[in-house]
Amino acid sequence: MHSDITPIHTHKKYWAECFGTAPFLPTSRKEMDALGWDSCDIVLVTGDAYVDHPSFGMAIIGRLLEAQGFRVGIIAQPQWQDKTDFMSLGKPNLFFGVTSGNMDSMINRYTSDRKLRHDDAYTPNNEGGKRPDRATLVYSQRCREAYKDVPIVLGGIEASLRRVAHYDYWSDKVRRSVLLDAKADILLFGNAERALVEVAHRLAEGEEIAQMTNIRGTAVNLAAEPEGYTIIDSSRIEKPRKEAFIPPNPYEVETQCETKSEEPKAQPITIRPSRHDAATTAVRLPSFEKLQNDRILYAHASRILHLETNPYSGRALIQRHGNRELWVNQAPIPLTTEEMDYVFGLPYARVPHPKYGKAKIPAYDMIKTSVNIMRGCFGGCSFCSITEHEGRIIQNRSQESILTELEEIRDKVPGFTGTISDLGGPTANMYRLGCSDPKAEANCRRPSCVFPGICNKLNTDHKHTIDLYRAARQVKGVKKVMIASGVRYDLAIESPEYVKELVTHHVGGYLKIAPEHTEKGPLDLMMKPGMGTYDRFKEMFDKYSQEAGKKQYLIPYFISAHPGTTDEDMLNLALWLKKNNYECDQVQNFYPSPMCNATSMYYSETNPLKRVKYKQREDVPVAKGDRQRRLHKALLRYHDPANWPLIREALITMGKKYLIGDKPGCLVPAEDMDARTPAQRRKSGRHGANRFATKHTSTQPGFPGDKANAGSGKKPTRGGQSNSAPSRSGSATGGKHPQRSGANTGGKSSGGKNSPRAGGRNQPSRAR
């Protein structure tokens, strides 16, 4: 039923390949004239500045289409108030490609408290206000005004995660699919190189875009159900008919899947195939109109959507919007290693477009010496949308391709000092890891390969990553290779050799990891491992740091106000932080970004990880009110005097007044401490001079075990890694990694290179 899969580098090139490769894709008529072009075949519109680097989505898309023989122009950060800028390159021969940029525009522009940000890391000089709210919609409208008959193709992280009816945090309601609101012709979701190349070539051959309804990784707006498909109705919460295949609960791991059986023959793992061919079957989701007023039904719809993300066994989705049908095709087939090498081996200039002059683009400065080695994540964290965008199957580059890029950085990046800032991706240590059983992988519906335990079919051998690190250190001109992507420590402890290699050679003083919480309730809903796993990793980290003769520290990150977190849970986390002498300045308040499971929990106050019924469901406590969200954030920053009044009030309400005072076990001081100066508070023993933010602090005066170091004032050596990094676009649709729903409330929008996650800790796409 679906069109055949063709390797993206084997298509016959379009006739315009004779124009060759442009130093930079043109952004003006003058640049087009210099290249000898009379028109553009494709015009890309993006909310980011144009940086010709594979960490920026439009650079990947532009160079990929150029390699297919098309003439591609870029309109970067246009004035959106009228159509003038959208006509600056003339009428495209084939289509407009529209994206908000590497981040969802709403997350880029607003904090998790819905406050306007005043900076933008993807804009020259970090200037805010250069893109509109809901940029995908606005840009599409202006393209339609400019040239009414030109097809509009949507892509990027904003479009990808809003492809179906979705809860929108900023308007606090369920919105329609962005495809219908934008009145575009087709939407590409996920890593869309394969779909984009097919759309471009079929348009070039004269096919109408309205006929392209069967391309994987696309969503289209139809008048009626397409013919030739069996539609399974899942639009209501009820017991399905007998003929409807219901897969086993993928969120519950059977014993034989989690641990190897002593008698494999006695308890074999069998793959139960669907009774319906995935290629000719679709699942009907509840209509947009029903989801608007039924939160429980929304949780059900979210659950169904997440069950259909496997590119091999997942089925198409159909959803009614008024009198129209939204048709979402199956997920795209992951790129092969050869295709990944092709995409990342395109002739990127690796610098911003010359029109920006000497203006600094923070996102570029953060990733100009980093390398994306893979895509995808099988961690399945509920606050993260990586599975819904990039997929669970890891797409790897070859070691040769990665080493070649290191040499390009050495030769092309101005001011290169010999330090590579990162070799990573959504996570640092999933390179060439995956399921050892192809048949199981093709049929698996589990959202995570590592929760609640590591699947025994998962290959956890880090040999390829270790070999890559060692080879990278041998590249001529490379003096130091750092790892800035978040380490998935539950995987790392399965390979002590990897931890030793990492700690000995690739940590610059601090290593970022994300336990996210300490309490079982929130951790289970986050689908994160318990603190016992963290403790095991910390022991290994400390051991190998000592063996290497280095003083190195872990930087643990935590989320406040995540669905399922009670005031008591946050208090216990605060007490754990105090006991372990951590003081967090970059606090991550939960940010409900589109499509992730945690956002469904936030909106529905129900757990979509389990079967959802009206009378039988698991209710989830959610911190929605501003005051409770402020309290949860304040408890993470228990050391800040500005938060003490709110914490005191909460402790009294909770019957925990004994935690107020100056005794070692107290969380905050009594009220008379508020009147003291910072120097007086330090002298009183509440805060030692050796405190430093969001880092592992040495023992502080006033806390147990402080005698050896009290007042030492010593700090560990700082590493060379920034806590901020932009999204590196592994996605052909405009963003490397999807947003994680945990976001920094400090107002920064600098873009996280390590993960969808939008706004999170100043990092729009961190993955865990």
UniProtKB/Swiss-Prot annotation:
Biased composition (Polar residues): 719-731
Superkingdom in the source lineage: Bacteria
One Pfam match: Radical_SAM_N
UniProt remark on cofactor binding: Binds 1 [4Fe-4S] cluster. The cluster is coordinated with 3 cysteines and an exchangeable S-adenosyl-L-methionine.
Domain Radical SAM core, chain residue ranges per copy: 363-640
Sequence segments annotated as region (Disordered): 674-768
GO molecular function: 4 iron, 4 sulfur cluster binding; catalytic activity; iron ion binding
Cofactors named for this entry: [4Fe-4S] cluster
Binding site for [4Fe-4S] cluster: C377, C381, C384
PROSITE patterns, sorted: RADICAL_SAM
Keywords on record: 4Fe-4S, Iron, Iron-sulfur, Metal-binding, S-adenosyl-L-methionine
Compositional bias of kind Basic residues: 679-689
Keyword Cell cycle: no
Keyword Metal-binding listed: yes
Family matches, as NCBIfam families: SAM_YgiQ
Family: Belongs to the UPF0313 family.
Protein name per UniProt: UPF0313 protein VV1_2212
Lineage of producing organism: Bacteria, Pseudomonadati, Pseudomonadota, Gammaproteobacteria, Vibrionales
